[in-house]
Amino acid sequence: MEVEHVIKVTLTNEILKRISEIDEKRFSLSSIEMPPVTKNRLRKNSKKKSSYASNKIEGNPLTEKQANEAIDSDPHKHFLKPEQEVRNYFLALNVLEEKLKKKERFSKEMILEVQAMVEKGASKEKIGLRGPMPPGMLFAVYDSETGAAEYIPPEYIDIPDLLEELVEYVNTTDDHPLIIAAIVHYQLVTIHPFEDGNGRTARLMSGY
């Protein structure tokens, strides 16, 4: 299948207005001085909420209190799958935060690393780019409630090129960071490069 290597962005007046409003609020918040300990506490609480909410979207049954307890628990204890999922997400947020401090470039390897962190504890088959389906079958995204096929993503053979296209866009575009975040999320869930963890990986990478 021939892949078209083009990412186009059309901004409406409404989108531009919203971006301007967000920039104004961000500037106001950035001018507020607070002790480092307060900043760190707010940052950690924000990452906890993200870890809970992102996994909740995927059907994780933990309450926010349970998710926070799992994150704060001794890392050497045994965790149930739902607990491991929120811990994995929190760890991935921390790793990406450190990469951002080092100004590491957005890359395909980074996407793969994040998905591996998201799927830590899962079967090896779920880690890494998805491969070919059995003859006569197509990989599809199914509705978790009805079981009906909702979307058929690109063929596995096209995934590397599509990811490279996304990486090139992120590293060369002059678009506003909010637009880049939206494109990263949209492209990753559309490409659906993995057997599992696509949504969580997309949300993590969109914040980088």
Residue ranges and their predicted role:
Residues M1-Y208:
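FIC/Doc superfamily catalytic core
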